Amino acid sequence: MLNFGTIGSGWITDEYIHGAKDSGLWNLTAVYSRDALRGKEYAAKHGAKLVFTDLEQFADCKEIDAVYVASPNSMHYAQCKTLLKHGKHVICEKPLCAQADKVRELVKLSQEKGLVFMEAIMFLHQPQLKLLEQAVQSIGAISMVKLDFCQRSSKLDRYLQGELPNIFNPQLETGALMDLGVYCIYPALYLFGKPESFQISTNKMASGADGSGIVTMQYPDKLVTLTYSKLGQAGADSDFQGTDGTIAVASISRLGGIRLLHRDGTAEELHGDDEKYKLMGWEAKDFYRYITQPKESRDEYTKCSELSIAVAELMEEMRHKAGIHFASDSAQ
């Protein structure tokens, strides 16, 4: 069993802690928070014995083997760099960084230190991903793919009332593309590689953040469309349309509700849905395996790192093409 600490106290950290503990491989020992009271309350909630308000001290703690990072996007780079420099394995929530160069730098640093640096993206670590891959191979030539993640933000009402929640604050490197679009980009690149070209259109909010977007990716033999939004709720599946059938996926981010629709009109359910903590538990299990079985998992882990860089590169291109700029871009 390995000991881990956390940065971040939102619902997603709750789910990761639940999943990691449920795996039987991880023990939560420490919590980092800039707010001492909040840190103590969060540690008590989850049974962590140590609380830190100083990042350097947290990173230097010998009772921590690895850290789960779920802070605002704009903080990922500096926090992950500090943790890696102090010899901690790191699993960081998507997206890793707004700029691909920073992702490359962190990957290189982790390699030099002999550490695991991994992006927490549910899609890539679910066992049903193999079912999806097999199904994609079974439906003939694919000409059209629609990947959708439109989910009305729980913070939207606050924004409409005049507040500025983190998710709609571009100073924190957020917005629909960074928060939800990444879940569509990952399967596109994982299954089909980088497109020949793409077009992107976004709906800008008064805060400067993108509230929704549409991307059309051109491949030699297919079109892949990405739709993502934090302003409204989707009512349709993602799907892969082939000459011999269609694969419908109710949740592309969770790989939940996967169905194979045959040409004769019959349907076959390939996978249902899972509780969120179990989905994140698979991330925690792979993270543990990459750390404890480096030789056996090297190829798989290397592919994960390469895909994280490819996703960061494409997302950065998309942002610039759509006119979505962050303050950190000027430092590049």
Residue ranges and their predicted role:
Residues 1-46, 324-331:
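N-terminal Rossmann-like dinucleotide-binding module
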Residues 13, 52, 92, 117-119, ...:
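Hydrophobic residues in well-ordered beta-strands that form the structural core
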Residues 46-109:
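Beta-loop-alpha module in the N-terminal Rossmann-like domain of NAD(P)-dependent dehydrogenases
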Residues 66-68, 286-332:
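C-terminal helix-rich "cap/oligomerization" subdomain common to oxidoreductases
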Residues 104-123, 143-144:
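Rossmann-fold dehydrogenase core element
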Residues 126-196:
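Predominantly a Rossmann-like dinucleotide-binding segment in NAD(P)-dependent oxidoreductases
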Residues 184-255, 285-295, 331:
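Contiguous beta-strand/loop segments that form the cofactor/metal-binding neighborhood of enzyme cores
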Residues 273-285:
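Active-site loop of classical SDR/Rossmann-like NAD(P)-dependent oxidoreductases
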